[in-house]
């Protein structure tokens, strides 16, 4: 036991929690904590260039490792700048603890300099928040915060710390709690055995079943159980955008991603299924389209650790509240008692016919660089082993469709909130967590400029990532919608006065490459990967065909079976 100030307790609490890295930006309300980081030691702090980037770095750190990311920001604008990143983590169920400074307790509510109600502002986008009023409460609050962030359905936690409880002259006995008890919070992890048996029996009787896997498989570390279970029952598997990598992308039973830009075979399989085994998903609007037309003949089996997600949008015939890993393990165990399991030959023959539509075909003989070719070439050169972060837009969808992910936690993107500017800082967070891995940020000319200042952070901490900028001089997804829905009226979707991205990256001390011709694509990507392996951050600016659209695309207001497919093109 030690006698410590509040600021020292913050640092010691992080150390006792096992935290090695935090991401932040100093300011008046948290200077005592920053001083303690220096005097106490034991934690590496990454100085970002904008607080939003701090949250995205912590987010990437968390998604790639499963650990809780930690952010430290000052009061007022420091805290509000973090809001977008907190919302991003909340929508995708990512564990994060955000420590925000606050004005002194006596000044709260008096519009003091850099005061804002961080608890009130963040309430809709956090799992829980704490306003700490006593120095001696810091250890127990931090213990609770990390438990809440990572248990049940993970999510972000805010800890708001008034400046006066951090001061050096306020010292108290420090003791890290051995255990905590939160009476109102007791997440269910073990699914009800009766419901599990009923769900398995229903699934095995089905003639047209499909497994629909989401991000909950990844957060529960149950990808291996999913693979074993799916193989044993020979069932087709489709994934949400957040679920990519939960089931091997090149596996024969994988029918690719479903939803707004899902493959023809995935969406048709869902529409015609008689049983949907949904696990670790929340049936968001990008995967269901019109709920009145959604999978009309299917019995829905829904497994999720969050009871509020079950039957929220799609009614579950057999709901199971529990951890995906536990439920799948129990189902695998129960399968041992089954004497005969159908091979679903007729169902697979139907799916193979849908696959022959080749909904991902595109003109590969064009004299312009196609974004699909860029992604496929990257997969070929990296053999699918890289960690890929993505910004939001067409490049995100092209990556999801043309880069098969065979392992979990390799695909890192903002799925729920759709946050542009996420990709670069998230990639830096991944690289910090996994310094020996190849980390690639796939972005566009719109998204990259939202947090491009973090090239400076990358330089300061020698975080070598590859930035692949699919440059179409426009806001590609906005332009696509304008083409399809607004009769081609391109209102403010073209990007004029773009910087020279190669020179810009070089000005930060990095290596830049521009690719303008299809014939040079593979050679220059190989050069970029070579420079990356030598420890350089590499910015690759690829001038792609700006007329290219993402297909398939579901028709607004339609069922899962109603999609726009690419017209056959002439070279």
Swiss-Prot record:
One of its GO terms (biological process) is L-valine biosynthetic process. Its EC number is 2.2.1.6. One of its GO terms (cellular component) is acetolactate synthase complex. FAD binds at residues 153, 261-282, 304-323. It comes from the Bacteria. Mg(2+) binds at residues 445, 472. The keyword Magnesium applies. One of its GO terms (molecular function) is flavin adenine dinucleotide binding. Its cofactor is Mg(2+); thiamine diphosphate. It is an enzyme of class 2 (transferase). Binds 1 Mg(2+) ion per subunit. The keyword Isomerase does not apply. Thiamine diphosphate binds at residue 51. Pathway: Amino-acid biosynthesis; L-isoleucine biosynthesis; L-isoleucine from 2-oxobutanoate: step 1/4; Amino-acid biosynthesis; L-valine biosynthesis; L-valine from pyruvate: step 1/4. Signal peptide: none annotated. Dimer of large and small chains. This is Acetolactate synthase large subunit. It comes from Buchnera aphidicola subsp. Acyrthosiphon pisum (strain APS).
């Amino acid at each position: 036991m030690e006698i410590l100030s509040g600021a020292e307790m913050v640092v010691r609490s992080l150390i006792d929690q096992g935290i090695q890295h935090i991401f932040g930006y100093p300011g008046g309300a948290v200077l005592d904590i920053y001083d303690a980081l220096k005097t106490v030691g034991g934690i590496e702090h990454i100085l970002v260039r904008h607080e939003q980037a701090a949250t995205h770095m912590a987010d990437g750190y968390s998604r790639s490792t499963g650990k809780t990311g930690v952010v430290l920001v000052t009061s007022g604008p420091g805290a509000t700048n973090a809001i977008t990143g907190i919302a991003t983590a909340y929508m995708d169920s990512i564990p994060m603890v955000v420590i925000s400074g606050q004005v002194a307790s006596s000044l709260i509510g008096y519009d003091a300099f850099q005061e804002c109600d961080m608890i009130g502002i963040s309430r809709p986008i956090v799992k829980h928040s704490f306003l700490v009023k006593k120095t001696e409460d810091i250890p127990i609050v931090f213990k609770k915060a990390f438990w809440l962030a990572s248990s049940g359905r993970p999510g972000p936690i805010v800890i708001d710390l008034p400046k006066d409880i951090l001061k050096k002259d306020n010292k108290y006995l420090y003791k890290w709690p051995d255990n905590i008890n939160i009476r109102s919070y007791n997440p269910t992890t073990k699914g009800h055995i009766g419901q599990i048996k009923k769900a398995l029996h229903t699934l095995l009787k089905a003639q047209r079943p499909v497994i629909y896997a989401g991000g909950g498989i990844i957060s529960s570390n149950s990808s291996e159980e999913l693979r074993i279970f799916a193989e044993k029952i020979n069932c087709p598997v489709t994934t949400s955008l957040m679920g990519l990598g939960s089931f091997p992308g090149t596996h024969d039973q994988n029918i690719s991603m479903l939803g707004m830009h899902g493959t023809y075979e995935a969406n048709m399989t869902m529409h015609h299924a008689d049983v949907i085994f949904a696990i670790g998903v929340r049936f968001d609007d990008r995967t269901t389209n019109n709920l009145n037309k959604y999978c009309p003949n299917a019995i829905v089996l829904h497994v999720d650790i969050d009871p509020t997600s079950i039957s929220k949008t799609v009614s579950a015939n057999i709901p199971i509240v529990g951890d995906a890993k536990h439920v799948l393990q129990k189902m695998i165990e129960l399968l041992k008692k089954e004497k005969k399991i159908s091979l679903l030959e007729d169902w697979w023959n139907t799916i193979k016919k849908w696959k022959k539509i080749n909904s991902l075909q595109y003109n590969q003989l064009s004299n312009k660089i196609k974004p699909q070719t860029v992604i496929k070439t990257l997969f070929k050169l990296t053999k699918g082993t890289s960690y890929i972060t993505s910004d939001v837009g067409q490049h995100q969808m092209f990556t999801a469709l043309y880069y098969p992910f065979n392992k979990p936690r390799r695909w890192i993107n903002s799925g729920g909130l759709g946050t542009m500017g996420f990709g670069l800082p998230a990639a830096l967070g991944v690289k910090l967590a996994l310094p020996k891995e190849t980390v690639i940020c796939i972005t566009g000319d719109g998204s990259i400029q939202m947090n491009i200042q973090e090239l400076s952070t990358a330089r300061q901490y020698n975080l070598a990532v590859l930035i692949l900028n699919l440059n179409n001089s426009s806001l590609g997804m906005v332009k696509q919608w304008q083409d399809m829905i607004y009769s081609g009226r391109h209102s403010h979707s073209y990007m004029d006065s773009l910087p020279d991205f190669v020179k810009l990256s070089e000005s930060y001390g990095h290596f830049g490459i521009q690719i303008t011709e299809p014939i040079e694509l593979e050679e220059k990507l190989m050069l970029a990967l070579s420079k990356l392996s030598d420890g350089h951050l590499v910015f690759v600016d690829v001038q792609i065909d700006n007329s290219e659209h993402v297909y398939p695309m579901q028709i607004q207001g339609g069922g899962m079976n109603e999609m726009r497919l690419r017209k056959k093109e002439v070279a």
